[in-house]
Amino acid sequence: MRLLKYPLEGISGNVTSLVTIDAEYVVVCGSRGDIQVWHQQQLLDTAFDRCTLETLKPKYSFTFELKDDEDELVFAMGDRDCLYLGTEHSVYSYSGWLKALESGHTTLENKLIYTTVSQSIITDVKWDSLLDILFVLTDRPCKIHLFDTRSANKKEITSIALDKNSKPLTGVVDPSGAGTFTVLTSDRSIVVYHINRTGDYKEVKKLSQHVLVYPLHYKITMPPQADFLPIINSLKGSSGAAGSTATVLLNRNENYKVMSTLVPSASSNTKVLVHSPKMYEKANLKRGTISRYNLVATSTNTDGSIMIWNTKRGKPLFAPLNISDSAINDMIWSSNGLTLFAVSNDNVLYTFAFLQDDLGKTVPMEEIENIRQSNIIKEPLPIAYVITASDGLGDISTSKNQGLGVAADNSSNILSTDTNTNEKNLSTVNTTEPQTNSQSSSYNNKPESKLDSSKSEITSADSSDEKAKNLEARPIEAKSKKILNGKNLESKSSSVTTSDNIQKKVEDSKSNVSVTATEKKTKPDKKSIKSENGESKVNKAQNTISPKESNTTDNKSTTPDFKNPSYQVPKDLKRKPKEDALGNAVTKRAKKDLEPVDFLDTGLLLPNVAFSRVRLSTPLIRMNIDCTSSNDSKILLNIRNGSGNEQKPTIVKLLDKTVTPERTLFQDFIPKFVSLATSGDDFWACSSEDGTLYIFNDVGRKIIPPLTIGVPISFLEACGKYLLCVSSIGELYCWNIASSKLEFPVTTIFPLLSPSIRYSDDILTRAENITMCSVTNNGFPIATLSNGDGYMYDKNMETWLLVSDGWWAYGSQYWDSTNNSNLIPDSSTKPTEGQSSTEISKASIVTLLEKKTNNELTRKGRIKNLRRFARTILMKEGFENIEEIVTLSHLENKLLVTLRLEEQHEFKKLIKLYAVKLGELGYVDRLRDLFAWIISDSNDNGDLIPGINRKELVKTLLTACADLRSVQRVTIDYADMLGYLPNDIFFDCESQNDTGK
């Protein structure tokens, strides 16, 4: 394989799409309308070093004039005859564009096909070259517009209306010509339609909760044999890891079951998925078998990586290629399946040139056609003929100019084929006729399709008595046994042909169409209606007859509308969503049930909350909310919720209850419901139900303009000068109110909820509840879960740290050491400035989290595991020292946490206890490492943390470990190095010599 990376010049904006024209050209389209046509062979020669980069340049170039400066060219497709370009508001066509460029023209004329109205946006444009139908997907309203690209004016033949909540985002075209079109919608559904050339459609399959797509411009293609449907970012068949996505291949012949899964790297969403137009095969010489497979190239919407997969093995051919720092906007294969072209967002054209040995031998198209014939094809759409006759001339035609109308008559009336373009939504039968020399040359450039036409019996009913007067139109039924697999050829011969000549021509052709003429009496309810000039016309309600139901008058889809399912998370972790067979039955309340509490709650349903990875509960709106000051319990913030609007706003008061009667310090009105309130040292904060924060000082002045979070708030806590806010989608904010700044970038609590365990394939499940979420006086967020784990957020490391774990409760000797005598502060300890002795004796944050862990273990009945731990694990062989290892691990974690929290008194006690424990257990190397860590920066006499000097701390530890003989060698070395040995804490050498010792 060779890779050519070529930066494009002369294209303003970003390159958005690629188009290959046979095996000759590749068209590169820029967002600002700059279009370049490159010769594929020149790119391949450059990739294989057969020519230099200096000679590489585009073959042709022209500019697509945008009507609006804000519009961008995002869609492109076509062939040699016509090129279709589209923006998010309009679609245009360039007929004969390549011939004009080859003739030397640089300015081409385009024709408007479709333009949106009001606020509608085009989400995708697809072209079926076999059916000659252009699909335009729009929102507001959600529709699929179908345009006939064979006609000169590219007229719209029909449109498919979708549910207003099912916004079509992208479509997938069937390359086999079987007439299926797949749509991926915003409500995670996949809808498959069966469509014929006249625009008649029928919904054949709808898969709900299958795919997660966003408002992006996706590019998805099917394999050439069209036996499976690729679905990107599927909700089915994923590996279950958090943030992982998968591409699944749905077998169309087995009711769209998952036949294979392609799992890319974690936390990536596929944007481009293109199948090679060829099938490949490799022979296994050892087993004597031949393996056939498809190749598909995928790329994500976040990085510039490209992967090429073998669909048979479900594995990529090679590791992901990170070829660009920006995202890949589009990819396309050459017609021979040996070259892959890609463009990135930074305007670089990539050419992957493969050899035959790299990918495998290509399968001939005849064998691919045989595989297409084996696909299960849906029943054909309803079929009907429209026959019109006039004085002296009988015209037999099918709607939309489809098929060949033939009539047999004994008289000498002249018959011909005609086109009826005014009738819409009429079903037709597809018949074929050998291509004549008089046909348009525009079809000569297209390859002929192998057609399987069904045998039809056409009966023309005439009355011999009425022939002399005029010809009456009669409906003719046609029975079809099989859907045609190719495009029908139109009969455009304008020569006058008699009935005998037409009969002979049909019998000699290879179209297997038998035509018989029989005379029938006209039924009373199918009479023709004569116009004033004598012409005979058929009522529109009578000239459309289904082959199965003759009374069918409209062949549009009759699929009923359904209400979209709810995406709420079930309360039971293992329960699947079930339908309520009894309906909304009223359940009786048990006698001992508590009386319900009335809350003022509007129950907002927000899409960004419903589809978020984290969904936290929010407090219900209460009538009254009281919040006391952290400094003085007599200062009270009282909130009275009104009606949530301007007519009766919410009243916010700050009351001083130290005097009688109570005094109002300030009062404010908020035209919203208030859900939470908190207080700091010198500020008050409250939040509304829609996620707006209001912050006041003690006299009622707003310190900061109202902060808009956008979603309801689940936690609102304050301590000192810091304010903590956790939204219902898991976003965590921490502000320094004194400086009006964000303390650290916005983070999330998603890592705390065990996403790798709690993510399910089918539905989201509930994680552990968050029992506490607060902030320390130094601005460190802390959180506890219902399983007993406690965490703190390190703003320097920008990640969550584990503080307390239930595992340490089982094995550590110093777990929940509130009453441990070694940790009680000495009486000689003096409080620092601004800190009382009462605060020193209080339990630290680590001890608080350990208490919460104990409470959760007790609540869940897991305390009994402590006895089981001592009775079973400690007595097993190989686990004799597990208790001391768990104890040291617990002490080390507490040391590191208190160091980051800057709790100097707790840190002193813990490090002293830790050093003594190391000495008692004989961990000499670890004790030596502890001393080295403390004095590693002692030359500048700096503090380890504010208030703790490094040398003084080492002196304290040396004194505590002086009586431990097993570590005296370490303590003496460090005491001598720091100058404590001769005159301070150990012994006096001179006094010992005088006494003779």
UniProtKB/Swiss-Prot annotation:
Residues 409-446, 491-501, 539-567 have a biased composition (Polar residues). InterPro entries: HIR1-like (IPR031120), HIRA-like_C (IPR011494), WD40/YVTN_repeat-like_dom_sf (IPR015943), WD40_repeat_dom_sf (IPR036322), WD40_rpt (IPR001680). Residues 464-480, 518-538 have a biased composition (Basic and acidic residues). The keyword Transcription applies. One of its GO terms (biological process) is negative regulation of transcription by RNA polymerase II. It holds the Pfam family Hira. GO terms for molecular function: DNA binding; nucleosome binding; transcription corepressor activity. WD repeats lie at residues 10-48, 117-152, 153-194, 274-319, 323-362, 665-706, 708-745. Residues 408-584 are annotated as: Disordered. GO terms for cellular component: chromatin; cytosol; HIR complex; nucleus. It is found in: Nucleus. Keywords: Chromatin regulator, Nucleus, Repeat, Repressor, Transcription, Transcription regulation, WD repeat. Required for replication-independent chromatin assembly and for the periodic repression of histone gene transcription during the cell cycle. Belongs to the WD repeat HIR1 family. PANTHER family: MEMBER OF THE HIR1 FAMILY OF WD-REPEAT PROTEINS (PTHR13831), PROTEIN HIR2 (PTHR13831:SF1). This is Protein HIR2. The gene is HIR2.
